[in-house]
Curated annotation (Swiss-Prot):
Null allele phenotype: Reduced levels of serum triglyceride. Mice gain weight more slowly than wild-type littermates due to a reduction in adipose tissue accretion. Plasma levels of triglycerides are similar to wild-type animals in the fasted state but decreased after refeeding. The lower triglyceride levels are associated with a reduction in very low density lipoprotein secretion and an increase in lipoprotein lipase (LPL) activity. Glucose and insulin tolerance are not affected and no alterations in glucose homeostasis are observed in mice fed either a chow or high fat diet.
Gene: Angptl8
Protein name from the UniProt record: Angiopoietin-like protein 8
Subunit structure: Interacts with ANGPTL3.
UniProt keyword list: Hormone, Lipid metabolism, Secreted, Signal
Sample GO molecular function, one term: hormone activity
InterPro entries hit by this protein: ANGPTL8 (IPR026614)
Biological source species: Mus musculus (Mouse)
GO biological process: cell maturation; fat cell differentiation; lipid metabolic process; negative regulation of lipoprotein lipase activity; positive regulation of protein processing; regulation of lipid metabolic process; regulation of lipoprotein metabolic process; triglyceride homeostasis
Signal sequence segment: 1-15
Record's note on what induces expression: Highly up-regulated following high-fat diet treatment. Down-regulated upon fasting. Strongly induced in the cold environment (4 Degrees Celsius for 4 hours).
A cellular component annotation (GO) from this entry: extracellular region
Localization, UniProt: Secreted
Tissue expr: Expressed in liver and fat. Enriched in white and brown adipose tissues.
PTM entry text: Proteolytically cleaved at the N-terminus.
Amino acid sequence: MAVLALCLLWTLASAVRPAPVAPLGGPEPAQYEELTLLFHGALQLGQALNGVYRATEARLTEAGHSLGLYDRALEFLGTEVRQGQDATQELRTSLSEIQVEEDALHLRAEATARSLGEVARAQQALRDTVRRLQVQLRGAWLGQAHQEFETLKARADKQSHLLWALTGHVQRQQREMAEQQQWLRQIQQRLHTAALPA
């Protein structure tokens, strides 16, 4: 900036040509006064340009600082977005695994229900047999028939207990499946909400 001011002063000085020597008592002092004013104006212009240069330099420095802050903020946001995407992917993977477990549990519950149906049918057949034996024993209370009756009755009681236990097991599995389905619905809702644009 100082070089620019010196160049400007040199240009102004070379532009002002010395006037021919005037006789004594001529306008020579006025020319020196004009030259002084020109130099003073050039100096003020140089100072003003120097001020503008410094202000512009300060603004550029501030803009560079702001740009650096903006870049860091963008980098931070990018990291946050990547972490959110990773968490969402992990959640989806967990959801898929839970869905597989729920399907397996559903298949086991269906198999248990089928077994329970078979046990119920077998118990009904056993009850029918017990009823027939009771009818037979009404007429004559025979020792061997009585023993067979007691054996069948014990088997019927045992199967009733087994049926009761299996029924409780199936009901417990159904409750667990209902809880897991509710939990899966909540996770799917959170995933759907997280996928919506902000």
